[in-house]
C-alpha cells in the first residue's frame, strides 16, 4: 500500500472555476501511482474525483465541502464553499472507473459557521 498526498493548486478553489483536473496535471505535482500496490490519495477537494481516479488512485480520501453546509433529506448537500448548488460529491462513498472516493462532512465549518441537518463527522477507515 502507498499513500500519496496531493495539494490542489489554488486556482482550483476559485469560485466558478471549471471543475476538472487531468491526470497529467496531477502527475506534474506527485509521482505516478505504484504498479501492483494499493494507492491511497489524500486530496482535500473531492470535486476533482474523476481526475484522481484517472491518475490511478484506488481510494481517495477527501473533505472540503463540509457535507454541503446544510443538507436536505433525500437530496443531500445544498451548497459548496465555491457557491455551487447541490455538489455531486458532498459526503459519503462514491465510485468511478472501479476507484473509490470517501468524503467526510468533517468537524468544522466554512465561512458561514453553521450546519443544518449536517452533523460534524469524523471518519474512521479500516483497511484490510
Please name every model-derived segment:
Residues 1-128:
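Soluble catalytic domains of enzymes that build or remodel membrane lipids, polysaccharides, and related
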